[in-house]
């Protein structure tokens, strides 16, 4: 759904016009229609959008929260505000045109490139030939001058800089008016805050939306608060989702997080006498082994997602990578028949109701209140943000490497030749065999629709599928040569295809099941230096690399081991790898990874 984007300085200016009409910032054309060209940002399908529509219909008693034009959906009840420019005494309103603060370009009439009202300069066009200068040049003040037959800009006063526009009462506290609707500050995501954007909302919707997104938390004036974290938490429901699923409060079992504490010899960085100094020494390592992950029973997973091993779920103050697990089978095998046998908190009255196991690290509300309060406040609709996916190369069997990893491995020239040899062989086959080229471009020839041909590439794709003799034409040769040049260019940038994939990390999942019934003894099931992945052969050495690859230390050499218990109780795909963080420095080696896929994806390669 598209939403309006506006500059803070324009909102400020149109809300402080000398001849203001009360309608504020104008989003309409001269004909009175909404100018959808200004709607350049999108409000993703999310829990926020679902709730916004619901609240709007309750308040206004109608169903026009959004409108459609040419197949696209728009809403004017949320506005994305940017703070890119300061508000100046004279603001640019087009090429070489300046308009005084408090006025709009449409309100001025330039005569010989200048507009003066009651001996006050309102607008001016600079660097253009003037037939005759204005009779009283003092109206130019210290902002403009007249020389060589043209008006020139020589200075400008800043009324409010970008920071002041953000903090100024006019926006954050008083809000602004747009198209006759009052808007107030709503929220911003961590990504938006980095680029200085913020969402504003129709004031009539704000109170109910804010009460909902904060789970009724009451933050008092002067109360100590990690504001950056709080803003991030209330923005969890604005994340784009692909689907929803229903989880009832009684389906939850909340267990304690577990921290593995041990010592390891690492290269540590310390601050000494005003300098950062790196030293190899023994440090105490703390790993939260269930950080950011949950276990979800297979029966709760929607049918179309049952073949995935992980679903990233969001709700109010909840964010967790939820791994496909046979929780009820675990309870049955361990003779757990009553909720009193569980090692955690639940609202369930019967053991069969337990469908998801999580920890306080996934429930952000626990930083402000209790898990019991959160369970009583949440609605059963959870958003599915994403799931693990195979790569696009060779049906997920290959993964594209990158120059950071190649530099980390410090390969010799001979090693590099060995690494590139399969790629060169493949390029040679693409050059010489049209069937392999067809496979490479991966075009669905059996489902070719009879549609207009919109590009040269599409013509090539379809002709290759229709007649093999097309591979003997000059058009085919040109296409093939362009493709090969592109493949070689990718190799030069370090994008080498290797046997591997991107895998989401599942940390100590079986230990989490043990912890849920009180049998966890603090020991790892697979042991140090091992992983469990169905993607690779067992008893083989695997090289894992953090993605994104931040530094040369983001590599992990481990052994892939078989484990019948993991296979029995977890429904893992090839893109989920079971890892161990008990007594093993995996989290810091991978730069503080947790098990949410936003920062726990790891490229795996047989080595």
Q: Where are the model-predicted features located?
A:
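Conserved small-residue
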Residues: 1-588
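Hydrophobic, aliphatic-enriched repeat segments that assemble into extended interaction scaffolds
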Residues: 504-507, 593, 604
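Short hydrophobic-aromatic micro-motifs
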Residues: 543-545, 600-603
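Short active-site loop/helix that positions an aromatic residue
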Residues: 589, 602-607
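Duplex nucleic acid-engaging cores and interfaces of nucleic-acid transaction enzymes
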Residues: 594, 599
């Amino acid at each position: 759904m598209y939403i309006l984007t506006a500059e803070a300085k324009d909102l400020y200016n149109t809300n402080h016009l000398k001849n203001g009409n009360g309608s504020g910032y104008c989003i309409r054309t001269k004909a009175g229609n909404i100018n959808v060209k200004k709607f350049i940002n999108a409000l993703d399908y999310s829990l926020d959008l679902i709730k916004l529509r619901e609240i709007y219909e309750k308040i206004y008693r109608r169903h026009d929260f959004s409108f459609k034009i040419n197949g696209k959906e728009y809403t004017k009840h949320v506005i994305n505000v940017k703070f890119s420019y300061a508000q100046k005494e004279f603001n640019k309103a087009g090429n070489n045109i300046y308009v005084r603060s408090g006025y709009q370009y449409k309100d001025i009439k330039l005569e010989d490139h200048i507009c003066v009202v009651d001996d006050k300069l309102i607008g001016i066009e600079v660097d253009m030939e003037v037939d005759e200068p204005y009779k009283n040049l003092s109206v130019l003040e210290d902002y403009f001058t007249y020389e060589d037959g043209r008006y020139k800009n020589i200075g400008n006063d800043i009324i409010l800089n970008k920071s002041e526009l953000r903090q100024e009462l006019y926006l954050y506290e008083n809000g602004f008016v747009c198209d006759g609707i009052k808007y107030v500050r709503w929220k911003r995501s961590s990504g938006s805050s980095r680029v200085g954007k913020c969402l504003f909302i129709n004031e009539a919707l704000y109170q109910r939306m804010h009460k909902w997104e904060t789970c009724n938390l009451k933050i008092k004036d002067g109360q100590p608060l990690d504001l950056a974290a709080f803003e991030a938490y209330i923005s969890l429901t604005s994340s784009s989702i692909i689907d929803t699923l229903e989880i009832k409060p009684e389906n939850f079992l909340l267990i304690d997080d577990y921290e593995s504490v041990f010592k390891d010899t690492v290269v540590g960085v310390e601050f000494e006498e005003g300098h950062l100094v790196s030293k190899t020494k023994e440090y105490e390592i703390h790993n939260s082994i269930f950080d950011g992950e949950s276990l979800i029973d297979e029966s709760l997973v929607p049918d179309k997602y049952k073949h995935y091993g992980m679903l990233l779920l969001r709700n109010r103050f909840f964010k967790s990578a939820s791994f496909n697990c046979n929780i009820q089978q675990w309870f049955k095998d361990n003779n757990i028949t009553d909720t009193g046998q569980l090692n955690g908190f639940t609202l369930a009255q019967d053991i069969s109701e337990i469908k998801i196991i999580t920890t306080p690290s996934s429930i952000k509300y626990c930083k402000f209140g209790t898990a019991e309060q959160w369970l009583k406040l949440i609605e059963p609709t959870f958003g599915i943000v994403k799931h693990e996916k195979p790569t696009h190369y060779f049906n997920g069997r290959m993964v594209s490497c990158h120059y950071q990893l190649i530099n980390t491995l410090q390969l010799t020239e001979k090693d590099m030749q060995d690494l590139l040899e399969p790629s060169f062989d493949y390029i040679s086959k693409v050059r010489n065999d049209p069937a392999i080229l067809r496979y490479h471009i991966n075009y669905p020839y059996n489902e070719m629709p009879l549609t207009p041909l919109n590009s040269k590439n599409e013509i090539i794709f379809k002709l290759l599928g229709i007649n093999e003799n097309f591979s003997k034409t000059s058009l085919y040769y040109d296409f093939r040569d362009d493709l090969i040049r592109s493949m070689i260019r990718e190799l030069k940038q370090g994008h080498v295809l290797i046997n591997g994939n991107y895998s989401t990390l599942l940390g100590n999942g079986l230990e989490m099941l043990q912890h849920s019934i009180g049998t966890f003894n603090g020991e790892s099931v697979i042991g140090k230096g091992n992983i469990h992945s169905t993607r690779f052969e067992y008893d083989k050495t695997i090289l894992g690399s953090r993605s994104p690859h931040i530094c040369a230390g983001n590599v992990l050499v481990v052994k892939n081991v078989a484990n019948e218990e993991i296979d029995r109780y977890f429904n893992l795909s090839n893109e989920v790898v079971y890892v161990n963080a008990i007594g093993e420095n995996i989290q810091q080696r991978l730069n503080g990874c947790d098990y949410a896929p936003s920062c726990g994806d790891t490229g795996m390669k047989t080595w």
